[in-house]
Amino acid sequence: MTNIRKTHPLMKIVNNAFIDLPAPSNISSWWNFGSLLGICLILQILTGLFLAMHYTADTTTAFSSVTHICRDVNYGWIIRYMHANGASMFFICLFMHVGRGLYYGSYTFIETWNIGVILLFATMATAFMGYVLPWGQMSFWGATVITNLLSAIPYIGTNLVEWIWGGFSVDKATLTRFFAFHFIFPFIIAALAMVHLLFLHETGSNNPTGISSDTDKIPFHPYYTIKDILGALLLILALLLLVLFTPDLLGDPDNYTPANPLNTPPHIKPEWYFLFAYAILRSIPNKLGGVLALVLSILILILTPMLHTSKQRSMMFRPFSQCLFWILVADLLTLTWIGGQPVEHPYIIIGQLASIMYFLLILVLMPMASTIENNLLKW
């Protein structure tokens, strides 16, 4: 009798994706983050669903409905903080996942990579809209400042901003539509993630060496299912430590003050995972230039396959490129720190230098290092 998991139309898809999938025998823990992102997404959809049952998307009651969730709903506080801190874990996993792709040359799977970049944009948009929903001070002013950036677009800018706002300022219409989008987007992300996996399974996974692993494959189950479960346990442990001990560590105290259009907070800043892009935006004195730099800071990832000049795929055997990669990581951490600081000396100049360094590393220095390494191979 044939095994049902190999014959049943639905089970067959699951089997070919998670059980009998041929996987390289040498993929390290850096390959865990894909499955961790899947877990984060499921967690966010579930906690978000339960929050949506008690939340009201109205400017007069949004803030108090979040308070009501935390005070009166059974385990509402843990659902709310799991959702808020789950977003942080999601972005940590995302950055690790993208970093892994850059380090080991996974961007040469162009379709998979491009869908991944679209996923990154979609996740950032979702997180931004979610941050607006509690209708605290930082929610309101963050929404005002970030949506207002679109007014820098020539000719259609002002009309576009008013169209998104649904009026002449961030108000009830804005909150309602942001809630609608925030609810639907995770399902779009889930669909895109499936396309991402579909493209990945066309080629098979990359591995740390960057060399084809067709000659040495092992089944995904039990080897990598066990490995992924370990990663998942560590992720859930980290999330629970954050939620149960320091739930407000990554939040902004200003968001515990209800939104007030007449009172601007001293430092308007987004959540920590957007600070690197926010620092790049602020480091350019011109509004349109800043917006372009902001978009390009993420969109630049699409160019990486074209900027790959090395004869080797992975950075595993390329010390110069490795060095530049870790300088890029340090640069991004610097930008994240600067994004959270006030706009004054010396933070302005540090931010500008770090922004220049960011684009210089990706567009010029890393391709140059790869070319030098190619020449060294001839010696």
From Swiss-Prot:
Residues bound to a ubiquinone: 201
Amino-acid positions noted as binding heme b b562 in the UniProt annotation, renumbered to this chain: 83, 182
Name of the molecule in the record: Cytochrome b
Annotated heme b b566 binding sites: 97, 196
Cofactor(s) the protein needs: heme b
Family according to the record: Belongs to the cytochrome b family.
Alphabetically ordered keywords of this record: Electron transport, Heme, Iron, Membrane, Metal-binding, Mitochondrion, Mitochondrion inner membrane, Respiratory chain, Transmembrane, Transmembrane helix, Transport, Ubiquinone
Additional remark text: Heme 1 (or BL or b562) is low-potential and absorbs at about 562 nm, and heme 2 (or BH or b566) is high-potential and absorbs at about 566 nm.
A GO CC term attached to the entry: mitochondrial inner membrane
Record note on cofactor: Binds 2 heme b groups non-covalently.
Lineage of producing organism: Eukaryota, Metazoa, Chordata, Craniata, Vertebrata
Disulphide bridges: none
Subunit structure: The cytochrome bc1 complex contains 11 subunits: 3 respiratory subunits (MT-CYB, CYC1 and UQCRFS1), 2 core proteins (UQCRC1 and UQCRC2) and 6 low-molecular weight proteins (UQCRH/QCR6, UQCRB/QCR7, UQCRQ/QCR8, UQCR10/QCR9, UQCR11/QCR10 and a cleavage product of UQCRFS1). This cytochrome bc1 complex then forms a dimer.
Principal location listed in the UniProt entry: mitochondrion
Subcellular location: Mitochondrion inner membrane
A Pfam match: Cytochrome_B
Gene Ontology biological-process annotations: mitochondrial electron transport, ubiquinol to cytochrome c
Transmembrane segments: 33-53, 77-98, 113-133, 178-198, 226-246, 288-308, 320-340, 347-367
Task performed by this protein: Component of the ubiquinol-cytochrome c reductase complex (complex III or cytochrome b-c1 complex) that is part of the mitochondrial respiratory chain. The b-c1 complex mediates electron transfer from ubiquinol to cytochrome c. Contributes to the generation of a proton gradient across the mitochondrial membrane that is then used for ATP synthesis.
GO MF: metal ion binding; ubiquinol-cytochrome-c reductase activity
Organism domain of life: Eukaryota
Membrane topology: Multi-pass membrane protein
